[in-house]
């Protein structure tokens, strides 16, 4: 690069005298405006004090204001914000030039109207909620946003639709606490620049279409029936295993079956009934059917065979009995 070109570029980079004058006037304009506004404010304040002095003591009642314990007063003097928040208790204002707004610091509740929401699995549900919030910075809630309360209410509706739209129907029904916590965090982050603190969010009611309710009821009933069948099958399996084990044990002992048979007869005899039906051993019929020499079998009528069997039992157990075609009666 030639030295002449360097000099030309430096001259172009340096502002001209006219440009410096314009910049100086622009920079000095806010200072001059602030100076003029300060003089005007001082004059108005002085005239207000003179008016207060001339109308004393009537003007004292116009200067004294009271703020409740749960309120704070944000004061504007000639349209400018007074940095200090007033309250609670008594504070003084200058009539005609001071205005103030009372800000309630108590927790307010807002019932979010029912919102039609399309869940992530394309199911339309109606959900309503309740939001609890309060003002923690009175000045910011007045200066930072046009209407902090209404803005928070509108934001609660949009946040409810946005967050629930990212969840499935089963998650909405089962994870209400988690969804409420996510909604609280989202609202709190959005309203903090407005001087609003979100204390709590609760999903109050989730309503499903009638067709979806019937489908879910049928699914729940089918699930319960399937569970009951599984439990019954498992019970039968355990009972069968126990019976098989008992049969194996009894088969290994010759007297176990006889003892079990006697216990059963004892239990039946203790019942107050005139008719008792009990199993009849087929071995007795086999012994009775074989009559005569050479072991040749002869067929007897069933009634006579039963009577003969019962007579044999009488001789063994000395128990009086009568037989019928359907069974034995004691």
Swiss-Prot record:
Composition skew (Polar residues), residue ranges: 1-19
Gene3D superfamilies, sorted: 6.10.250.2090, Band 7 domain
Keywords: Membrane, Transmembrane, Transmembrane helix
Membrane topology classification: Single-pass membrane protein
Domain of life of the native organism: Eukaryota
Record-annotated disulphide pairs: none
Transmembrane intervals: 42-62
Region (Disordered): 1-27
Family membership noted in the UniProt record: Belongs to the band 7/mec-2 family.
Entry protein name: Stomatin-1
Organism: Caenorhabditis elegans
Gene: sto-1
